[in-house]
Amino acid sequence: MSFSFGFTSNDFDDDELVAQPETFVESSKENENTTAYINPLDSDFLSQAGVVQPNVEDLGTILESLKDVRLTFEEFQSPIYRKPLIKRELFDVKHQLMLETDAQSNNNSTELDILLGDTSEDLRKNIYEGGLKSWECSYDLVDLLSENVDRISNDIDAVVEIGCGTALPSEFLFRSALLRNDRSKGLKFVLTDYNASVLRLVTIPNLVITWAKTVLTKEQWYALQKDECEDIPINNEELLLTSKLLAAFYDDVQSRNISVTLISGSWGRKFSNLIHEVLSGSQKVLSLSSETIYQPDNLPVIAETILDIHNLPQTDVKTYVAAKDIYFGVGGSITEFEAYLDDKINSEHLPIHSERFKVNSGLKRSIICIETNKAIR
């Protein structure tokens, strides 16, 4: 497999990479000679107090919470192939949070302080994992997917995005599904993020805006926002989420045989069990993840989460993991991730293979493709 827009096969000089002092490569045979092997998905720290446990969020409840919210958004293009994308403006998210905080003056949430930018943090472990911002590697996935979007769309019946945040790769595939309008074949979107607030504030708003910009006529764009109130101002850079518009979104997506499942909380065995349950019956799954391997402690967990998706019975799975080669100041690296995968695949003779491609950019980034033997091509 090759990608013409700037990905090359894994061919690095040693001096291109900085070795990390901590390694996670530990084969099953070595475990047999020491202590009993514990899969990272079953690690005790994943169920400790303070770690948000996985939960399926109700789409209807989220849509109801967004009623009468006016979204300000940006329309832009992917860097290589100039594919149209939409994302809610970060300042608009903060504006909504401030309004909601004023309405609930007793709110004293550390997560809220971080979301509002009061702590000047991009993330904090087990509190907020950076999902409100769109990170570079998500754009890389969009450009990669755009090379074969028609073939991918014809093949898959489910998309899983792990650590989705603004969910730009899924948004791109969602828009593609809307344009194809093939109602004879179902398509599941399973969007996951550590923070339920991220799913509510950016993941779903981005999908709703994308739907409105893709599906609605000019007349519908105005009518669904005015909702019989002619005094409401309407423009092209904002979308007012009236009851009628939200109902139209929900009904239209269902009529197209598209489902959206949202999962919040930490990775681990409970999370993986939920993924298996949601994907039950799926035959061709595309799994996506970007900027999720930056924490060394969680690197084995995300690796095992992905491998566990590839263990779905009677299901072909293909995964793309996009990341920076090295996360300076944090400790994670794509080399550590790749080494963990290779050791696991080889030691347990898994029917999976992986390949690494490099993104041509100023900041070194890569994408790892993981496939089952009969995965989507």
Swiss-Prot record:
Membrane-crossing segments per the record: none
Localization: Cytoplasm; Nucleus
Gene3D superfamilies assigned: Vaccinia Virus protein VP39 (3.40.50.150)
Reported phenotype of the disruption mutant: Loss of Protein-histidine methylation. Impaired early rRNA processing, resulting in a deficiency of 60S subunits and translation initiation defects. A haploid deletion mutant leads to hypersensitivity to echinocandin-like antifungal lipopeptide caspofungin, a 1,3-beta-glucan synthase inhibitor. Deletion confers sensitivity to the synthetic tripeptide arsenical 4-(N-(S-glutathionylacetyl)amino) phenylarsenoxide (GSAO).
Gene Ontology annotations for the cellular component aspect, listed alphabetically: cytoplasm; nucleus
Main localization category: cytoplasm
Disulfide-bond pairs as recorded: none
Keywords of this entry: Cytoplasm, Methyltransferase, Nucleus, S-adenosyl-L-methionine, Transferase
Enzyme Commission number, as recorded: 2.1.1.85
Record field: catalytic activity: L-histidyl-[protein] + S-adenosyl-L-methionine = N(tele)-methyl-L-histidyl-[protein] + S-adenosyl-L-homocysteine + H(+)
Keyword Ligase: no
InterPro entries registered for this protein in UniProt: Methyltransf_16 (IPR019410), SAM-dependent_MTases_sf (IPR029063)
GO terms assigned for molecular function: protein-L-histidine N-tele-methyltransferase activity
PANTHER family: HEPATOCELLULAR CARCINOMA-ASSOCIATED ANTIGEN, HISTIDINE PROTEIN METHYLTRANSFERASE 1 HOMOLOG
Family under the similarity heading: Belongs to the methyltransferase superfamily. METTL18 family.
Free-text function comment from the UniProt entry: Protein-histidine N-methyltransferase that mediates methylation of RPL3 at 'His-243'. Methylates ribosome-associated RPL3, but not free RPL3, thereby regulating 60S subunit assembly. In addition to RPL3, mediates His methylation of other proteins.
This protein's name: Histidine protein methyltransferase 1
Organism of this sequence: Saccharomyces cerevisiae (strain ATCC 204508 / S288c) (Baker's yeast)
Higher taxonomy: Eukaryota, Fungi, Dikarya, Ascomycota, Saccharomycotina
